Design a protein with these regions (language model features):
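Patatin-like phospholipase
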Residues: 1-267
Length: 267
């Protein structure tokens, strides 16, 4: 687990400030350098006309506490900024008269559009937060760091549990004939690099120096290449991650008990 010595003094000062003041107080003009970078880098008019891929971006509706998923034709600069709006750093982003925060609170990422609105069987998840850590955090900042990771992973785990449930319904042929065409056995793939990510603290998310960013890019590409070398042939054929073994535990037991009951009755 990253130590306090790995965190720059500027992070501690900024963290302390955000606990005392809101962005409406310390950043009244809502200055966000990322907004300028996105505006200069992405042609949103061209993006909205794209019909070769489906892009889904989620944001949290502040008033209702519900997730809103924006589709390709709806995406503009405000949508992108809303999806990354951490409320202790930036003012809520207003879209069509409604305020939004970071989508990660309810979907990190939101998976359901990928199997409700696409025909592909393969679902690939690229993790940017470590799922597990070997040590129990002891310092205040280590504890907050781990809480941050668990909070943002919780929505993903809930969706993975739902996917695992449907996969078991299909596997054990528990769907009525009239509903079988409405569900398919999603093939789940998980790209993780916990050995790299566990060395980084929440403070690393505030680092913007070029060397750090390019280093993370290179490590990400190396991780993806390694995954493809090992698993490319599995795409479209079978899962490459054990949902129950890596993320869940109770769902399998429920279905195994169900199968045992049926076996007992049949005998």
């Amino acid at each position: 687990m990253p130590s306090m010595a790995d965190m720059p003094l500027s992070y501690f000062l900024f963290d302390s400030m955000t606990r005392l003041l809101s962005p409406y107080q310390f950043n009244p003009f809502d200055i966000n350098p990322l907004r300028d970078v996105m505006a200069e880098s992405i042609d949103f008019d061209e993006l909205r006309e794209c019909d070769c891929i489906k892009l889904f971006i989620s944001a949290t509706h502040v008033h209702s506490g519900k997730v809103r998923v924006f589709h390709t034709q709806e995406i503009d600069l405000d949508v992108v900024m809303a999806s990354a709006c951490l409320p202790f750093l930036y003012k809520a982003v207003t879209i069509e008269g409604e305020d939004y925060w970071d989508g990660g609170y309810l979907g990190n990422p939101a998976l359901f559009p990928l199997f409700y609105e696409t025909d592909t069987r393969d679902l690939m998840i690229v993790h940017i937060n470590p799922m597990e850590r070997d040590e129990t955090p002891k310092t205040a900042h280590e504890i907050m760091n781990r809480i941050n990771e668990i909070s943002f992973n919780s929505s993903l785990l809930k969706e993975l549990r739902a996917i695992a449930f449907v996969k078991k319904l299909v596997e054990y042929d528990m769907l009525k004939d009239e509903h079988k065409q409405d569900f398919m056995d999603i093939l789940v793939h998980s790209v993780r690099s916990d050995d790299i990510m566990t060395k980084l603290s929440v403070a690393s998310k505030f680092k913007s120096d070029w060397d750090f960013l390019t280093d993370m890019r290179d490590k990400g590409r190396a991780t993806m290449k390694s995954w493809l070398d090992q698993n490319f042939d599995a795409l479209g054929e079978h899962d490459t991650v054990d949902l129950h073994g890596e993320f869940l535990n109770s769902t399998t037991k429920i279905f195994e008990n169900h199968r045992g009951d049926h076996t007992h009755k049949a005998s």
